[in-house]
Amino acid sequence: MIKNSVMTVQIKYFASLRDRLGRAEDRFSVAETTTVAEIWAGLWPETPLPPNTLAAVNMEYASLEQTVRDGDEVAFFPPVTGG
């Protein structure tokens, strides 16, 4: 029998997402095959991911379909512009 292990990831929120959610970070336990999008849905089931939100895993841009590993840091942030 194959059993999914449970992992813990750290979640960080930046800029307007941090303000909207009222917190800067979370810790979340997930199964081995969990994606970045599933993390958001698990933490915020009543709050859809805002359009154009970017994600990073371990400080590198990531797609919402990327799976995470134990101990990963997942960050969500709005698009960044500058001048």
Language model: regions and residue ranges:
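Ubiquitin-like/PB1-type beta-grasp interaction modules and other compact soluble beta-rich domains
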Residues: 1-82
